[in-house]
């Protein structure tokens, strides 16, 4: 059965914040900097003009505390909960660790074939099979190869309680690329037990592939770069993917026109798939991902080049899906989840996006009238991932040389 998301649900939980008004999209851009304001704005349109005028609306703050659970994680990237409540955590340098009963230990991995660790490259996301309690399968994304030729790979292994055994590479992204940027790499599962994998566009200018800027791969349907891919749990391609019958397109593609998605969440209740995506200088995006749709990069974008000037003359087009939210200046979003727990009743149904540059978690509420309201939760470290734990608390991984696992708890 072809997977189709439901329509956007109404989020009715009250927002307990102080808020200020801002239009969501802007044609200007500055060097990325922290933005610790709380923002409200209309549904994105190409003509929106940014403002910072407070509307003097006061609401009671939600009280919470930040608890440091673990310190000294080396560049942690992803996390996944085992049925017993233990947490598997990846470190980009090639390690998997387990936090169990307050103790952090390294997990042995039989082999990660040809792993490439440099810049943004290395061991990245981790996810459990939906039927992990029956098959013990764990999925890892990582960069393989070397600086001259590399790609994102998906490794599947079994967790025997102490080690990851029987590793098997079930998928390698094509074409190969050079450099050490834009691997994407988040994994989420759909209700039919197929998985979506976010793949980056390959890197920034002047990096090229086949004589043109590599980022143009995001618009090419014969390339897996700059895409969200949909695969079966063995790495094979579902027969109902949107481009399977297009002989000039790659059949693994689910959506395209992406720069570098590092936040991806599939909500089993609404059956919606949300993604946060890095822009260049500004133009970070929150998108609702749908099968077969084009999200614009680099043909349509609010980003500016790092060297100056606009990436694209267009910020909207009829054949391109508009983002639900755009951040300028950049927050560098990474990690995304939609809260469905009971610990924070007022936050239920809200999205939470990690932010590397602004070193915060952004709480996002989309109201019935399509107004988007944001609260920023300062963390003070680069936020790589944010997840809801099995206990209903919110967990945050910080991307530092001495990274931390932080838990948000109500007071």
Model-derived features: where do they sit?
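N-terminal secretory signal peptides that target proteins for export/translocation
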Residues: 1-11
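C-terminal motif of bacterial Sec signal peptides marking the signal peptidase cleavage site
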Residues: 26-28
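Acidic, Gly/Ser/Thr-rich repeat motifs that build Ca2+-stabilized beta-propeller blades
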Residues: 30-203, 263-266, 272-279, 329-369, ...
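Surface-exposed loop and turn segments in beta-propeller and other repeat-based domains
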Residues: 108-121, 167-183, 224, 231-254, ...
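A detector of repeated loop/turn-to-beta-strand junctions in beta-rich toroidal repeat architectures
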Residues: 151, 214-218, 225, 283, ...
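Beta-propeller blade signature
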Residues: 152-162, 216-233, 289-290
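Short, conserved, GDST-rich strand-edge loop motifs in beta-rich repeat architectures
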Residues: 197-221, 283-285, 289
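Conserved blade-ending motifs and adjacent loop-strand segments that build the rim/top face
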Residues: 258, 370-390
């Amino acid at each position: 059965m072809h997977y189709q998301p439901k329509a956007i649900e109404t989020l009715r939980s009250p927002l307990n914040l102080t808020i200020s008004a801002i239009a969501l999209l802007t044609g200007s851009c500055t060097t990325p900097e922290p933005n610790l304001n709380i923002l409200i704005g209309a549904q994105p349109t190409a003509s929106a003009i940014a403002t910072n005028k407070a509307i003097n609306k006061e609401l009671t703050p939600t009280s919470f505390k930040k608890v440091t659970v673990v310190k000294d994680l080396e560049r942690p990237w992803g996390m996944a909960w085992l049925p017993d409540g233990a947490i598997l955590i990846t470190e980009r340098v090639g390690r998997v660790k387990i936090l169990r009963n307050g103790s952090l230990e390294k997990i042995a991995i039989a082999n990660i074939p040809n792993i490439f660790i440099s810049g943004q490259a290395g061991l990245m996301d981790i996810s459990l099979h939906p039927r992990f309690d029956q098959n013990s399968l764990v999925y890892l994304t990582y960069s393989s190869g070397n600086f001259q030729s590399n790609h994102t790979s998906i490794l599947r292994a079994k967790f025997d309680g102490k080690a990851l055994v029987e590793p098997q590479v079930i998928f390698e992204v094509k074409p190969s690329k050079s450099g050490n940027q834009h691997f994407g790499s988040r994994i989420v599962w759909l209700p039919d037990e197929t998985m979506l994998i976010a793949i980056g566009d390959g890197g920034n200018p002047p990096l090229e592939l086949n004589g043109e800027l590599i980022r143009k791969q995001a618009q090419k349907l014969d390339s897996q770069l700059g895409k969200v891919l949909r695969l079966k749990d063995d790495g094979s391609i579902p027969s109902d993917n949107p481009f399977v019958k297009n002989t000039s397109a790659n059949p693994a593609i689910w959506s395209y026109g992406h720069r570098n998605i590092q936040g991806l969440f599939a909500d089993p209740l609404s059956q919606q798939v949300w993604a946060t995506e890095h822009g260049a200088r500004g133009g970070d995006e929150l998108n609702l991902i749908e099968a077969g749709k084009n999200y614009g990069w680099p043909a349509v974008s609010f980003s500016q080049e790092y060297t100056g000037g606009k990436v694209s003359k267009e910020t909207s087009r009829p054949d391109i899906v508009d983002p639900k939210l755009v951040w300028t200046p950049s927050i560098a979003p990474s990690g995304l989840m939609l809260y469905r727990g009971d610990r924070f009743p007022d936050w239920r149904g809200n999205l939470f996006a990690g932010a590397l540059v602004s070193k915060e978690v952004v709480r996002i509420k989309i109201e019935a009238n399509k107004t988007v309201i944001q609260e920023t939760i300062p963390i003070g470290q680069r936020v790589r991932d944010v997840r809801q734990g099995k206990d209903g608390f919110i967990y945050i991984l910080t991307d530092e040389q001495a990274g931390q696992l932080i838990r948000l708890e109500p007071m």
